[in-house]
Amino acid sequence: MKITILAVGKLKEKYWKQAIAEYEKRLGPYTKIDIIEVTDEKAPENMSDKEIEQVKEKEGQRILAKIKPQSTVITLEIQGKMLSSEGLAQELNQRMTQGQSDFVFVIGGSNGLHKDVLQRSNYALSFSKMTFPHQMMRVVLIEQVYRAFKIMRGEAYHK
């Protein structure tokens, strides 16, 4: 079992890095977890739609280059399906039962994900209709993955 969080951009703030490191440590007994960062494109404000699409395409190419053919890709999208913590645990457990063992969660850049990445996705997941900073979403995602493993094992973390 392997979980990868594939994200556009780098974590800069120490407090986000510390939170991620804590959950990586907690996930150790359950799964192998990798965090892969791909370079984000410089995206000045007031870009045209064409420029936004070009940024998304370049970031999308970098994302797709990091995904193996056998990986199950779960993209984080505002239009994705909203699940409870139990629902995420059930979704992962069901896919593991079907023999899937390499999961890649994709967090796009500030302009979203390119259509090629969306087409490669096996499942579109949404945490909210709201928009959150990408750094924060990494922490929320890794915490929910940890919570899902605790739920799947029937352990006490989840309340």
Swiss-Prot record:
GO CC, alphabetical: cytoplasm
Subcellular location: Cytoplasm
Alphabetical list of CDD domains matching this protein: RlmH-like
GO MF entry, a single one: rRNA (pseudouridine-N3-)-methyltransferase activity
UniProt keyword terms in alphabetical order: Cytoplasm, Methyltransferase, rRNA processing, S-adenosyl-L-methionine, Transferase
First-level EC class: transferase
Catalyzed reaction equations: pseudouridine(1915) in 23S rRNA + S-adenosyl-L-methionine = N(3)-methylpseudouridine(1915) in 23S rRNA + S-adenosyl-L-homocysteine + H(+)
Sites where the protein binds S-adenosyl-L-methionine: 76, 108, 127-132
Gene3D superfamilies (alphabetical): 3.40.1280.10
Stated family: Belongs to the RNA methyltransferase RlmH family.
Complexes and interactors: Homodimer.
HAMAP family per record: 23SrRNA_methyltr_H
Protein name: Ribosomal RNA large subunit methyltransferase H
Native source species: Staphylococcus aureus (strain MSSA476)
Upper lineage: Bacteria, Bacillati, Bacillota, Bacilli, Bacillales
Gene that encodes the chain: rlmH
